[in-house]
Every structure is written in C-alpha cells, then in structure tokens.
UniProtKB/Swiss-Prot annotation:
The gene is Ncam2. GO terms for cellular component: axon; nuclear body; side of membrane; synaptic membrane. It comes from Mus musculus. The chain crosses the membrane at residues 698-718. This is Neural cell adhesion molecule 2. Residues 495-591, 593-688 form the Fibronectin type-III domain. May play important roles in selective fasciculation and zone-to-zone projection of the primary olfactory axons. It comes from the Eukaryota. Residues 719-837 are cytoplasmic.
Amino acid sequence: MSLLLSFYLLGLLVRSGQALLQVTISLSKVELSVGESKFFTCTAIGEPESIDWYNPQGEKIISTQRVMLQKEGVRSRLTIYNANIEDAGIYRCQATDAKGQTQEATVVLEIYQKLTFREVVSPQEFKQGEDAEVVCRVSSSPAPAVSWLYHNEEVTTIPDNRFAVLANNNLQILNINKSDEGIYRCEGRVEARGEIDFRDIIVIVNVPPAIMMPQKSFNATAERGEEMTLTCKASGSPDPTISWFRNGKLIEENEKYILKGSNTELTVRNIINKDGGSYVCKATNKAGEDQKQAFLQVFVQPHILQLKNETTSENGHVTLVCEAEGEPVPEITWKRAIDGVMFSEGDKSPDGRIEVKGQHGRSSLHIRDVKLSDSGRYDCEAASRIGGHQRSMHLDIEYAPKFVSNQTMYYSWEGNPINISCDVTANPPASIHWRREKLLLPAKNTTHLKTHSVGRKMILEIAPTSDNDFGRYNCTATNRIGTRFQEYILELADVPSSPHGVKIIELSQTTAKISFNKPESHGGVPIHHYQVDVKEVASETWKIVRSHGVQTMVVLSSLEPNTTYEIRVAAVNGKGQGDYSKIEIFQTLPVREPSPPSIHGQPSSGKSFKISITKQDDGGAPILEYIVKYRSKDKEDQWLEKKVQGNKDHIILEHLQWTMGYEVQITAANRLGYSEPTVYEFSMPPKPNIIKDTLFNGLGLGAIIGLGVAALLLILVVTDVSCFFIRQCGLLMCITRRMCGKKSGSSGKSKELEEGKAAYLKDGSKEPIVEMRTEDERITNHEDGSPVNEPNETTPLTEPEKLPLKEENGKEVLNAETIEIKVSNDIIQSKEDDIKA
C-alpha cells in the first residue's frame, strides 16, 4: 500500500514538475524474538543525496557484522542478526537531498524473550532421606507458568504431600527415597503466545552403603599353608566401593592377600599366628559409607608329622609309629581299614598280639606274631577340640610261596591233552618252575610238554603219547622269603565203573521210568551221560536210550503192553563207555479200560460251556470216544447225552440256560471198555448285555457313534412308515399325497390297514409276519383260553407248530419270549428258542 502511495506521489510531482523528497519503510512495527534476525527496507522518492539509519538511542547506525546496512539506489536495507533485548526501540530512516532537506520514516521494533531454560542439569542426584530440590530455571517475557510432571501426572495432583513446587519454580521432594527415582518433566507455558516448552530431568537417589557380612568369625590353622576367605557384600546406590583395613591400614593385594569380586572377598594366604585379629570392611559411595569387622581366630590344628609304610615278614614283629603336633595337643587313635577296628592308647587286641602305647603327641602300634590278615591299610587320626588330621599307611607282610589249589591228582589218556595248574600266591611274587624228577620243563625233545603263565598260575600242558608221560610232576615256587614245592600226579584215566541200584519206579502199558545210582568210580574223567539198553526178552536187538546229561533217571517210551523187557545201564566218560550194570527185568502192564478222564471247564461263547480234557491214562489202548451226559441240577431234568471222538481235547455243551447249574458225567472208552465216569458241576453265568458284549465289543468310539446314528435314523424311518400305514400321516404320507394327489386307501386292503388288522410280509425276506390288531380284537383258544390269531387274507392255511414250555405247576403255556417265528415255503413255523439239550 505504501509502495503504491509512493508511486502516486511521484506521479504528482512529475506532473507538477516539482521533486519532493518522500521516505517510506516496508514495515512500521515488528515483533521479534530474542535470537531471531530481521531486515527493514527504506525507500526514498525524489532525489536523495543520502539515506541513513538511526538506532533507538538516536545514534547513526554504522554497518557491522551483526547490524548491517545495504544501499541500492533509492533504497537502504537495515538487517539485524540475532536480535537481543537491547535492540528494541524506534529505528529512523532519514533521507537527505542536495539542498540539505531531510525526510524520515520510522519503524518500531519490539523484542520479546521466548521460553528459555538456563543451566538445566540432568541427571540431578540426591541422597536418600534428604529434602531434595530439583532445579529448573526457566525464563521468558512475559514470565512463564511452570509445572512439574512425574509419570505423565502433575505432581500437585499426586496424593503425597512430600511433593511441592517452590516459588522459584523448583520442585521440592521431602524425605526422598529410592522409589522417587525417575524422570521428571519441567514444563513452561506463556499464555499470551500459546508457547510451551519442557525439559526432562533425571532424578537419581543415592542410597548409603549397607554391609552384609554372612560370617564374622573365622577359625584357621597356622603355618600349614592354609588360606581363609572373608566375605563382605554391600548394597547401595550407586554400587559402593569396598575396601579392607587391617590395624587401620588399607589392605592391598600382594602375596599375603588376594582380593576378588570387586574386593568383596579377601583371602588371607599362608596363615600364621600373627594373621589373627580384626579385619575391617568399609563400603563407600556418594551417599555415605558403612563398615563392619570380621575376626580371624588362628589355631594350630593337629597335624601328623610322621607316618610311613612298613614291611615285615609273616610271624615277625612290627611297630607302627604316628607322630602329630597341634595346639592343644591332639589325641591319636588307630583304625584298621580291613575291619574298621579302632585302637587307642592302652588298648590291646583280644588275642594280645596288638597293643597301643603312647606319649605326648606320639603313638606306637605294636603287632607280634604277624599274620597275613594283619596286612593292609592303617589310618592314624590326630584330633583335638578344634579339628583333626588323618593319614594312612600300608603294612606289607612278606611270606613264602603258598599253593592255593589242593587238587594234585589229574587223569587223562594217550592223545588227550590236559592242563595241570600250579596256582601260587606269594609276597614278593615267586618264580615258578615245573620239573619231572630233576629235569626242568619244558626240555628238549619234549614237544608234548609245554608251560605258560597266566597271572599267578603256571600251567603245564601235557599231551600224553605213551605210558611214560604218566606219573609225578613237581611245581617249585621261590621268593626271597623261602622256597616251596608241590607234587602233582597224572594218572591214566579209565572208563567208569558200572552203575548200580537200577530199579523201576513207574510203570504203565507203554512206558517205564527207571532210576539208578552213580558208579563208584568215574575213571578220573567226568561222566558225559548214561546209556540205557532195553530189549524184549525174546529179542536179540538192544535199543539204546541216552540220558539227559548226567541225570540218573530215564523214561522208556513206546513199549508194548503186557511185555517183558530187559534193561542194563552203563556210564560214559571221555575215555569211553564203562561196564554195564546187571540186567534188570520188568513187565509192562496189560491193556485195560481207561482211567476216569481229568477235566476242567470254562464258559464259552453264548449259551455254551467248554470242558477241556487233559492227557490221561488210556489203559494202553487209544481212547475211542467220550460219552458225555449232562442235565440241569435245579430242575433235575432227564440226562442228555452226546458222544465226542476220542482224539478231541475238549467238549462243547450248547443251548444251555443262563444262571442255571449243571451236572456232567464224562466216561472214556477204549477197545476194552469204559472208564469210571468223572463227575463235574458248573453254573452258567447271567445273561450278558447284548449291546455291550455283542454289538460294541471291540468297536472303537467312531464305530459306536456311527452305529448310534444309524440306529436313530432306522427308528425314525420305522416310525414314519408306521405312521404312514396306521395313521396315514408322516413324511412318507406327505410325499405320497404330493405325488399321487389322493390317499392310497380305495381298496379293501387299505380298509383293513385303517382297522389295524392286516399282516405284512416283506417280499423275498425271511422276517416274521407281523400282525396288527386293536386291543379288543381277540379270539379265545377253546382248550386253554389263550388268545390265538384270527385268520385273515395273509394267514397260512396250516397252523404253525407250537412247542409248549412246561412250568413247575405242569400247565403248558406258550411263552411269547421263547417263540421264534420264521417264514419258509409260505409256512410259518414256531419253535422254542431255549431248548434243553
């Protein structure tokens, strides 16, 4: 607008021919924030000789780096960089023409201060328990409104009177604690400008150290190279620094002291007497310090100085010495490790061979007439009220060689190699040699004689080639304690002598069990088996039967009934077969009737019972058949009989009654006659759950659910069909009406359907004829008054056969539950379902 006015005035001057001087400034009033920059343009219309700027103090402005002047023809630009409060005021732009006439224009510059946070420190730290003042210096023009927020909530709204905003806008927290730690927001607002700014200040609460010393008293043993670790842990915030002091002096790590875990562990090494006393642990951080002391008590623990292994000879004398020191002087005890027997000063063993003698810190264990059982480990224990020390030694007893095995007699024969073992124990170990007479074995030209060592044994392997190899052999064992020898004899083995005491212990028509006693001599070689020869008296040929191993009992089978046999027994070893025993004669039993059969039974499937026949005495002739008679016990019915082939091992009784008791007699028959009957009684179980035991037995859950759904659908279909025929309603009737448009009831047969009198039979099926009647339609039987079926168009001309059941009162009735109706060749036949077999 001012620019247009200038051009307008310029036009007037040109038009009037006069050059009047006019000055304008682009802005008349400006608000500027401290630190911002701004420029102003002054335009002089006319013929200005100069254009100058004057500051609010009236001083002519000279261009500087911060306040800069730029002239462009009739324009002069004043630029103020980084304005401050002192720059506020009225600035004048003055133009001067050649005649010295001046014109000026002014601009008002207002400087305001934005929200300014000065020297805001974060984090700010305080000591727990003190009254804290969180400093936040904020200024602006006009003065700001300051608020504090903690966890996005103004502290003035927190229900804790420990928080308050002071007049200097600082936040006061009384009795500050660790839970007050966090980030606090100092927020300033200038309502006039809608200006807002904030600073987040981290508040840290320092907690003075608190020392935790799990153990304050320690015991240690001096001058034994031991070490002791003192533990000092401290809590606090920030983590405290731990230092150890001894006699007021700071402990530093060296050969004596080891510091670990940020000085939480002090290890005192190579403890000596002067290391005893107090050790002070001091913990320090910004919030303060804490200290506690631990006490190290140094003792001289028992220590065994002298204990060494000893060696002695069998039947000799030895003294075991144990010396120990300590403060107080320890007591010394001995323990024999092999049996745990303890020996103290003055003790003696029951046999008087072992005795303990002792004096100040020294104990001696005396053993006389040393036995091999005295060898082994001995423990010496030195103990006092402050501890103990234990060491072990070994008593080694040397002795001359001893032969372990008592077997000195061996048997073999020519061509049969044998090993003779010389088992020797000795301390120190012995050297073992085999000799025959004075010849050291093995010798030249004795390839059939070999020796080899296996552990402490020296094996002599002999493969006899002649009688000269049988005889005496000598095993000699030698160590520095002595020499021992033992003689071994190799005898020529023989076949066993004859068994004796042969007798028959069991006899039947076809088998015989014999027993006998072992022979008095096995010939020097173990018996392999026994051979039993058997033949008929009139026969020349012996049949050979071998025993199972060395059993002295043999069963002869496949014999002929009522026949006389001869038997003899011989023992067989590696050398061969021995002499036979004397011949024994026996006669098998004649063929006779079989013995009563042995049986046991169990319920079978359905209404049947299974009787199993165990193997029995058939009397010497095969069983031809079993005659089975059975009847119910409850009603004492007539006996029912069935026959089973003799080669069967079980009998099945069928068509029995549930929960009924039965009596059974079973007789076995062979070609000579019948056995005595075996009587057996049993009771049938109750009737099972048909659905559970038949339909669902072994089916999975899915199959059972499927069957249930199928059954439900079947019930719905049957119900709908019944409604169709009886009530002329239901889904099927609805479909029929829709398809046919009228009821299917015009025939005489439909009329009978409505009256419920017609019977229906499925084409080609074997399902029973089902007759429908109303309740009042009954025809009485002329004989017993029972209802009978009224003839109709579907009734067969022949009456069905009825099998009556007899009740206890003798009256014959027709039980509906026992009738099974079948259709065959257009004739209905009825029969009883539960027929007694």
